[in-house]
């Protein structure tokens, strides 16, 4: 309630109590009374604002308790990367780092853009092969893959293949390699409208090498969901483990593994249907392994025109490793986890001078056992203090509000001092904005060394950070440099897809949506109301409305008729959606459908319709 309205109500109440009418109450009171009522209404307005602030703080605390950092923390961007191994059947490591320097527009000084290093790391230790897909043949077409994104037609090819058959010529990059084991292919289609149909046919694909059947396994060439005994014994599954599992599940449908061993042999030893590839095989510098993929005949070549087959690809996320070497004393030691203007993501390891791995625990009570490390972050860990940014913001607001009161004294010296103070405050405020001085508490470790062993020894502390939203929209084709620890791949790696999905820490509005979804659905999506709550929680401010209807569709299979569906119509918020790139919006929609299908118990398929 505004100060003028409060004063008006108090005046009316006072007039009735003292026997004055409404028409004469303005002129009947002494000016001192009016000044006192002014002061009273001003203080009451401040009390009202404090009550609103208290409500906000209570809601913030409740949300922090209900949704810890694992749920509402920052999410790294993810993408698909290609890297060529030096040796055959080498595994990538979760510790590997591929980096690129990105220039970010500086709104405060456009002539001095900000340079930020974006680091990407694998989410799965897949095996890479010393081979690449060199030729693709279907219908009347034979293409040579010139690089990862373009293919050139071979014009002297005159043969026509049966409908639904695709031949791949896989080039061996190493002269010492004569066979490939568990070759993994990344298969993607550029046209979103054909994606559902193509993936339906892709699941029915059969593979052969010279009439010998090849076992095709959907997914990666290493297990995704395996039981990690070390993780269970030594530490809890962390936020980073959940993120990597989510990324692996998201890209799972695009990877196919040819199980077993593919051996190289001369083209003349293949059956007669491969004789049309003799010219390109003999003219190629390196040996080729030819495989045949058989799809249903209803797969038209117009769909295959938009399909790419790529080897040596794997999912990556934006995470950067930090290492601290610190000598600790004989009692409890504190180590701040600095991230250089990035967002803290997760802990990796704490190792003492005797190579002992310390167990990393969440802060629960004041007792810390010897040989343990405790991670403390903001939120639930601190109830009785505000962060430095909150205190600074409070001081800025207070001095802005009260400076007008001092200026009313009319003294030139005080007025000039207040002008100078306001200028300094404006400079501090701009500096805080430029440095992204957010209301978040920097995490830190509390380490209690083992007695008589690790005292005075150097500890090695490894942890991860992410650029969150700043890591989004790195374009496909971006070349990344490999760090020194990436020995088994070439010095350069290439992005196959744009980076998408990076999110900063959720604000209170997003937390309320997540809280509402958790209360309504309890982790299960059954009713239309559950779908609606899940939709708002996923798309957040990018949509205004959601409508759920029952519908029908024609099945993709030529042998099936119509089937019932659940149609989800979302109305987008155009002003908010304009801030997203096309790839980011496509990722939002695709991840929404995948998460909805995995969490829902509905037997009917879902369809998503976008209403502008």
Segments from the language model and where they lie:
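Intrinsically disordered, low-complexity, polar/charged repeat-rich segments
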Residues: 1-612
């Amino acid at each position: 309630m505004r100060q003028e309205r409060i004063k008006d109500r108090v005046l009316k109440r006072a007039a009735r109590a003292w026997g004055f009418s409404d028409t004469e109450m303005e002129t009947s009171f002494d000016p001192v009374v009016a000044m006192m009522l002014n002061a009273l209404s001003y203080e009451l307005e401040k009390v009202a604002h404090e009550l609103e602030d208290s409500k906000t703080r209570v809601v913030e605390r409740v949300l922090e308790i209900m949704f810890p950092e694992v749920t509402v923390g920052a999410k790294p961007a993810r993408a698909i990367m290609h890297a060529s191994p030096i040796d055959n059947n080498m595994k990538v490591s979760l510790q590997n780092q591929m980096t690129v320097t990105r220039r970010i527009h500086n709104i405060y000084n456009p002539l001095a853009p900000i340079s930020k290093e974006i680091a990407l790391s694998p989410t799965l230790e897949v095996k890479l092969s010393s081979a690449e897909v060199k030729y693709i043949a279907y219908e009347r077409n034979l293409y040579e893959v010139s690089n990862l994104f373009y293919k050139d037609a071979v014009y002297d090819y005159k043969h026509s293949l049966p409908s639904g058959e695709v031949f791949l010529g896989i080039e061996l990059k190493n002269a010492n390699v004569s066979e490939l084991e568990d070759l993994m292919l990344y298969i993607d289609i550029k046209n979103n409208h054909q994606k559902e149909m193509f993936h339906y046919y892709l699941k029915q694909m059969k593979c052969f090498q010279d009439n010998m059947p090849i076992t095709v396994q959907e997914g990666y060439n290493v297990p995704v969901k395996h039981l990690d005994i070390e993780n269970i014994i030594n530490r809890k599954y962390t936020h980073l483990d959940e993120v990597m599992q989510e990324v692996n599940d998201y890209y799972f449908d695009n990877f196919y593994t040819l199980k077993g061993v593919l051996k190289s042999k001369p083209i003349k030893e293949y059956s007669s249907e491969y004789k049309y590839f003799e010219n390109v095989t003999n003219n190629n510098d390196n040996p080729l392994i030819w495989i045949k993929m058989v799809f249903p005949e209803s797969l038209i070549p117009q769909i295959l025109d938009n399909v790419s087959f790529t080897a040596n690809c794997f999912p990556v996320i934006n995470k950067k490793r930090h290492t601290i070497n610190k000598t600790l004393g004989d009692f409890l030691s504190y180590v701040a986890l600095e991230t250089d203007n990035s967002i803290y993501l997760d802990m990796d390891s704490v190792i003492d001078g005797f190579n002992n791995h310390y167990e990393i625990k969440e802060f629960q009570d004041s007792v810390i056992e010897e040989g343990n490390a405790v991670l403390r972050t903001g939120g639930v860990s601190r109830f009785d203090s505000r962060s430095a940014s909150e205190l600074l913001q409070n001081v800025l607001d207070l001095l802005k509000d009260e400076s007008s009161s001092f200026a009313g004294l009319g003294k030139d010296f005080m007025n000039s001092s207040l002008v100078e103070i306001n200028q300094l405050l404006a400079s501090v405020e701009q500096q805080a904005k430029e440095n992204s001085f957010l209301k978040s508490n920097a995490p830190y470790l509390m380490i209690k060394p083992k007695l008589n062993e690790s005292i005075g020894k150097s500890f090695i502390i490894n942890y991860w950070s992410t650029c969150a939203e700043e890591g989004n929209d790195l374009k496909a084709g971006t070349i990344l440099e490999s760090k020194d620890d990436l020995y088994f791949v070439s010095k350069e790696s290439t992005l196959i897809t744009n980076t998408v999905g990076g999110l900063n820490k959720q604000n209170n509005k997003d937390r309320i949506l997540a809280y509402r979804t958790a209360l309504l659905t309890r982790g299960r999506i059954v009713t239309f109301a559950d779908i609606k709550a899940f939709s708002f929680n996923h798309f957040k401010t990018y949509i205004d409305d959601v409508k759920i209807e029952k519908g029908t569709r024609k099945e993709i299979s030529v042998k099936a008729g119509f089937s019932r569906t659940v149609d989800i119509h979302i109305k987008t918020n155009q002003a908010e959606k304009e801030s997203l790139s096309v790839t980011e919006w496509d990722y939002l929609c695709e991840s929404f459908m995948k998460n909805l299908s995995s969490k829902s118990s509905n037997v009917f398929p879902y369809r998503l319709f976008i209403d502008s």
